[in-house]
Amino acid sequence: MRRPKKYEAGEATQYISRRAALRKLQLSLNDFRRLCILKGVYPREPKHRRRAQKGSSEIKILYHTKDIRFLLHEPIVWTLRDYKIFAKKSGRDRAIKDFRNLKRRLALFPEIKLDHIVKERYPTFIDALKDLDDCLTLLFLFSTFPSLHLIPREQSNLCRRLTIEFLHYVIASKSLRKVFISIKGYYFQAEIKGQKVTWIVPHYYPFKPQSRQEVDFKVMSIFVEFYTIMLGFTNYRLYHGLNLAYPPQFPSSMLQDNEETLKDETSFVSERIAALNFELLRTDKVQEDEEEPDIDMELLEQDGDSKRIIKMKQEAQEIARLRNLFKGLKFFINREVPREPLVIIIRSFGGKVSWDSSVFSGSTYDESDETITHQIVDRPSLSTQYISRDYIQPQWVFDCVNQRQLLPTNKYFLGEELPPHLSPFVDAKRDTYVPPEEKALHDPSLIETHAQSDDESDEEEAAQNEDDTVDQELLDAQLQRAYQQETAEYKKYGGPDGVNEDEEDTDDDFDGEQESDEEEEELDEKTKRLQEEKKKMSVQSGKVHKVNKRQLHKAEVDEHRLQARMVKPRHRNLFRKLIREKQSKEKEEWLLRKKRRNIDNDTKEAKKLVKREAKKAAAAAAAAASQLGVK
Amino acid sequence: MTKKRTVKRKVKEPEPTKEQPSVSEQSENEEDEDLLQAVKDPGEDTTDDEGIDQEYQSDSSEDLEFESDEEGNYLGRKVSNEAEEGEDDQDEDDDEDEDEGEDEDDDSDDDSEESDANEASATPKDDQPSSSKAAAAQTKEPIIQIIPRDPSKPEYEESDTSDEEDIRNTVGNIPMHWYDEYKHIGYDWDAKKIIKPPKGDQIDDFLRKIEDPNFWRTVKDPMTGQEVLLTDEDIALIKRVNSSRIPNPEHDEYAPWIEWFTSEVEKMPIKNVPDHKRSFLPSVSEKKKVSRMVHALKMGWMKTTEEVEREKQQKRGPKFYMLWETDTGREHMRRIHDPVSAPKRDLPGHAESYNPPPEYLFDEKETKEWLKLKDEPHKRKLHFMPQKYKSLRAVPAYSRYLRERFLRCLDLYLCPRAKRVKLNIDAEYLIPKLPSPRDLQPFPTVESLVYRGHTDLVRSVSVEPKGEYLVSGSDDKTVKIWEIATGRCIRTIETNDVVRCVAWCPNAKLSIIAVATGSRLLLINPKVGDKLLIKKTDDLLAESPNLDIIESERIKTAVQWSNAEPDEQEKGVRVVITHFKPIRQVTWHGRGDYLATVMPEGANRSALIHQLSKRRSQIPFSKSKGLIQCVLFHPVKPCFFVATQHNIRIYDLVKQELIKKLLTNSKWISGMSIHPKGDNLLVSTYDKKMLWFDLDLSTKPYQTMRLHRNAVRSVAFHLRYPLFASGSDDQAVIVSHGMVYNDLLQNPLIVPLKKLQTHEKRDEFGVLDVTWHPVQPWVFSTGADCTIRLYT
């Protein structure tokens, strides 16, 4: 029997280095990269790197040997080789200026076909939906790109088309759930067939020339090449699921890449948004106004009411409400507001939206329309305002969606300082710190108290306690004087007896305080004696045993600490790590809370100062006025 | 003709002055010329000096003639001829010029004359007016011009003559500056040097400019260096050329158009031949071609350009169709091996908001820290700097957006993936589920008494079997006996050396304390408690039994038994067992007859067993198995536990053999304690661990406890309660619940109950010894702070 050599079996044969893979596939590195991106082949982390690398311990990029063997049978490998041949031959034609031949060759450019790869990478439709995040984010980015050296115009046009189609689906299916304005862009989260799809639409204008080291557009372009195909097929299926015609038909000449739109970036963008404001053509003529009854709900009712099911039911109801959040509302977007995200949001929650027709195309009604309920404005003031509508800042729309209810608009009025915009994506496990604003959202009672404390009680207290002491004294003195005068007058003119007696009493109080003190002392002695006697006689009332909470807590902590030392030795490191993480998290939370407290105190102080100054000024003015009056 | 004359004069006037210096040089040439002249014109000797000048003059005149030729003036030439004929005197120079040329010149002259004659014959009328004035002739020239040009002959001749006149200098068409350094400027037909005319300086030029009214029309001929006076015609010509008009002034731009070929289509054919039939019939081959194309179009083999364009349009961009039939249906396809889907990116928190709550914004310190970690961004708390914008309109594009997208792309295709099980558990989950200490009472919870009196660290403590008194041994060389309930020190016994260990005899019928001080082991009667018992003990220890067995030398050298000295007797010491090395530990057997001592330095005699009743000692081991730390008797069985540095060996004392070796896997054992039932052993080590051995189970510890933060000095089991305590250098006494069940299948339950930390630290030492009260759940601990503490 032959003695097996080292690295002939096991992990060493399972992995193959990139260099070896290139040699095996007979491709250049660029082609290999392209193939990997398109086919979704990625390097693997071996269990034992040293063994997988046949003894060498430097870090190499390793692929599964099976993956590489799988690539070997891929038809697009031949297309990639054809590219090479094409480049060589057409280069020759160009060199010898055989343009006839060149033209013929160009017509026969080998096209790459990716349909089967989409199916292969995503065997079920749900798989494709799961992987839609990166796809959408990248395509939304590319749809804003100008024509670049490495990114052909066709590609960015296709991106634009597909993303708009997807947005139309989101609007038509009302599947948008969460939105968020980040400094990076607008986050949208939709729930499509139970999958949460999140994408980012960057703030305009995201493209900036980049150095080669920073960003390699070629790599991104290959990704986009695959993602466009994938999103196309996904859109197709999504549209058919809603009985919508695909490709969608738009009224007028939307999405036609005529020369004008290509030239002018602003018109390009405006057309893109305008397309969103139209209903799509349906394949079935039935208007699907009524909500499809939730089958789940019925099932749930049958199942009974465990906690989870109740929760699910509530969730379903809430979502049903959310889908028609803006129904019956008419929005008008002022021209300084970024329209695209707002149009998507408003339309997908059942609202109607329009904008200034003189500036951008695609508006459906005018600003002067009296039925408009909300006008979205992003500037400090507006000259002409209609009484019939609310003038709000764009954040209102986002916050409403995240809260799943129409919020009161008073905090979002024109020129108002906006409340913080909170992320709807926070994970309670990940971020333990909850800012007070979010707490208030969860607990409506906190809102009021918060508001009250902010607005009234605090200030009043402060005013009474500190600021107005002087004023108060002044006022009191004045009142007393007035009262004395009154009583004197009363004495003069005589009155009912009871009143007189009272006055006497008061006089006594004023005159003979010492007497009363002596009396009191006597009284005290008597009572003391009595009490002592009583003490002797009676059963003493028991004292409540006071539990020292702090000590108790300490004892508990100690106990816990001791028990924590009983963690099994094999878990000790993990335990320590977990504890350390927990502690750091707690520290973070504590820091944030402290910071917030300081900020709140500062703002309160500032408010107080302002108020005090205002009051002082008022008092000074009043004094001046009174002096004038006296004179 | 008047002009010619003027030219001559002009040229002549400046020449005489300059010529004189050059005469001598050119004398040879002159001679030749003279000869020639002599042949031709002997009559004109007088003009010898000016011969050259004249030549030039004539040259210039010929130039003129030539130029006039160019203009198409035939007249000029004729005039000159006529002048020759008519006015001999005046035009002698001309003749001379011609003569000076070669013989051919003559021929050419003749030719010219002939041509003249021809011209004259052709234009008989012209002769007469030409003699009058050139200006007058010019007006008539256009008419004349056409006629002489039509026939080629006169033209040719003309050019011929011009050639002859032109080539005065024979150097050819070369850059004339080659002759700049020479006196001559070339060679004439006779291969004679043509001498450069003298050059005037600038003053001369200036003077001439002032004086000479024709200075402006004087030009220098580069070939000969002669100055030439331009005629009016020349100037007119130059002007015409300059104004980009046709040089010939006679050319009439507005002459009536002569239509040579008519534009009208003639009705009648020019030729009288009828057309061929095939010009009327359609081409058969073309018809075939067209029909073939029509057929191809019909069959779809060929496409119109429109169709082709449309197809191209359609072809552009991918085609989409229903790729997946159902949402979840999975078609069997080859996929990549063991696919690992890439994890999604984290969703944004509040800090990423464009308008975050104020606490998320960085303050100065945080900003500084963030900026400081520029080179290692992974260490940053957040990968971006939170920012607040007043309105949505003010939010700019995120500068790193593209970069982030790109990095995500790189992640997707370049980042190695592997499936890892990520523990998503709470730390609490890892703590074993133990009963609450409150359910395991009683156990000591508070410090209730402190026994003070020692002046150095208290090494050891032991309790009377009945639980009334306490004995402690300290480094201040004293042994103190305390009353437990009051904390009063009843007696202090001074010894000669540091007291390492004290042990009260566990037999309640005896009142003996074994004290290890230096290398002596003292058996002390503490004289506390029952008087009868004290008496009985004294009596027992007073009489020494007669030794009938002779001890071996090995034991003799190691141990000597003796009764105490009288002064020591007073203190209570009854028997002294002197060892050969300092004793570290002493421990009693449960019955109180045997006691064992440990001398770490004793090599193979480091452990000794003494029998009190027989006053006899044994050395159980003949060979050293390591540095013995401590020893212990089994409470029930005749077993002996010996702890070396790393291991514990259990010996059967009856059979005198090793039963078991316990592997502690620790570096240094400090002490051990055995459960009263004898099945479980607790070992403390200096490496912070406590080991619980279940002797029935295995030779490895059942449980390793790391309750202490520092070296554990001692452990002790309670005799009745399921409790054990441990004292450590971290000044803590930890009381734990250690329940051993009678059921063999149930493992012992160990629950740490209470940490009692009241001892003070002194020189790295904390608690040195712990002991339980024999009856109550009370624990005593001795510490480096010279105190003994009681926890109840």
Curated annotation (Swiss-Prot), chain A:
Leader sequence segment: none
UniProt keyword terms in alphabetical order: Coiled coil, Nucleus, Phosphoprotein, Ribosome biogenesis, rRNA processing
A GO CC term attached to the entry: nucleoplasm
Annotated S-S bridges: none
Gene3D superfamilies the UniProt entry points to: BRCT domain
Pfam families: BRCT_2 (PF16589), Pescadillo_N (PF06732)
Domain BRCT: 321-414
Coiled coil: 510-541
Superkingdom of origin: Eukaryota
Compositionally skewed regions (Acidic residues) per UniProt: 454-469, 499-524
UniProt xrefs under InterPro entries: BRCT_dom, BRCT_dom_sf, PES
GO biological process annotation, one example: maturation of 5.8S rRNA from tricistronic rRNA transcript (SSU-rRNA, 5.8S rRNA, LSU-rRNA)
Biased composition, class Basic residues, residue ranges: 543-552
Protein localization: Nucleus, Nucleolus; Nucleus, Nucleoplasm
Modification type Phosphoserine: residues: S453, S457
Record-annotated membrane-spanning stretches: none
Biased composition (Basic and acidic residues): 525-536, 553-562
The UniProt record lists the keyword Nucleus: yes
Gene Ontology molecular function, alphabetical: ribonucleoprotein complex binding; RNA binding
Principal subcellular localization: nucleus
Region described as Disordered: spans on this chain: 450-469, 489-569
Family: Belongs to the pescadillo family.
Function: Required for maturation of ribosomal RNAs and formation of the large ribosomal subunit.
Protein name, entry field: Pescadillo homolog
Gene source species: Drosophila mojavensis
Swiss-Prot record, chain B:
Protein name per UniProt: Ribosome biogenesis protein BOP1 homolog
PANTHER family (UniProt xref): RIBOSOME BIOGENESIS PROTEIN BOP1, RIBOSOME BIOGENESIS PROTEIN BOP1 BLOCK OF PROLIFERATION 1 PROTEIN
Entry-linked CDD domains: WD40
One annotated GO biological process: maturation of LSU-rRNA from tricistronic rRNA transcript (SSU-rRNA, 5.8S rRNA, LSU-rRNA)
InterPro entries to which the protein is assigned, alphabetical: BOP1/Erb1, BOP1_N_dom, WD40/YVTN_repeat-like_dom_sf, WD40_repeat_CS, WD40_repeat_dom_sf, WD40_rpt
Protein role: Required for maturation of ribosomal RNAs and formation of the large ribosomal subunit.
Keyword presence, Nucleotide-binding: no
Per-repeat ranges for WD: 453-494, 496-534, 578-620, 623-661, 664-703, 707-746, 762-792
Entry's localization field: Nucleus, Nucleolus; Nucleus, Nucleoplasm
Biased composition range(s): Basic residues: 1-11
Keywords: Nucleus, Repeat, Ribosome biogenesis, rRNA processing, WD repeat
Molecular-function GO term, any one: ribonucleoprotein complex binding
Top-rank lineage group of the source organism: Eukaryota
HAMAP family given in the database record: BOP1
Coiled-coil regions listed: none
Annotated S-S bridges: none
Database matches in Pfam families: BOP1NT, WD40
Chain intervals for the UniProt region annotation (Disordered): 1-167
Gene Ontology cellular component annotations, sorted alphabetically: nucleoplasm; PeBoW complex; preribosome, large subunit precursor
Biased composition (Acidic residues): 44-53, 60-72, 82-117, 157-166
Protein family according to the UniProt entry: Belongs to the WD repeat BOP1/ERB1 family.
Claim: Nucleus is one of the keywords in the record: yes
N-terminal signal peptide: none
